Amino acid sequence: NSPMLMNTYNEDATQLGAGVSQSARTKTGWSIPVNQKIDNYYNRNQYAEMNQSTNQKIMLFAIERSDSYGERDLYVSFLKPDGSWTEPKNMGADVNTFTDEGAPFLGADDRTLYFSSAGWPGYGNQDIFITKRLEDTWTKWSMPMNMGPTINSPEWDSYYTIGASGDFAIVASSKPGTGSDLYKVYLPASAKPDAVSIVYGKVLNAKSKQPIEADAAR
């Protein structure tokens, strides 16, 4: 309900310039995009993709920068207390190759990463892979595992997205002789993110009855 968008915008929704913005779903459509302040953000590629974590405090990018290994690499940025974002950090050679990585999607566990790549061995010109974050630097990952021929085709596959339940995914795929379509696929246990519990509610100060701000514990 809150998609990230390429470019920044004026208050009348006309395009302002390069960057990242975010819109929100409303009862009547979509809000005017809100420009996101990201430290030293730039992208040397004409394409970019973003994904925000379930708690909206982590943002992943597929962009090309001076420290990229090849074309676009995967980067991570973290929300700061003032509402701005840290400078995008390259997620390392465990996931990035000397060609193109794209369409990152972070599972609700904040550990399981799905992404597309033309650099890792696959069935077509771009396949979807899964990897697990091993520690908190966001640069150490398990060996990316190809999602297999049930999901990946001899052509192009990308934009893998799953809900918090983790039972199924939506994927964009190009089959031989056709254009790109969206497909729904059910996930085996090996392809699911770690289970998480999402609890909604308010924690109030016993005396003032005012909300207490806190980070969720996993």
Sequence positions of predicted segments:
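Short, conserved micro-motifs composed of acidic
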Residues: N1-K202, A206-E213
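Short amphipathic beta-strand segments in non-cytosolic proteins
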Residues: D215-R218
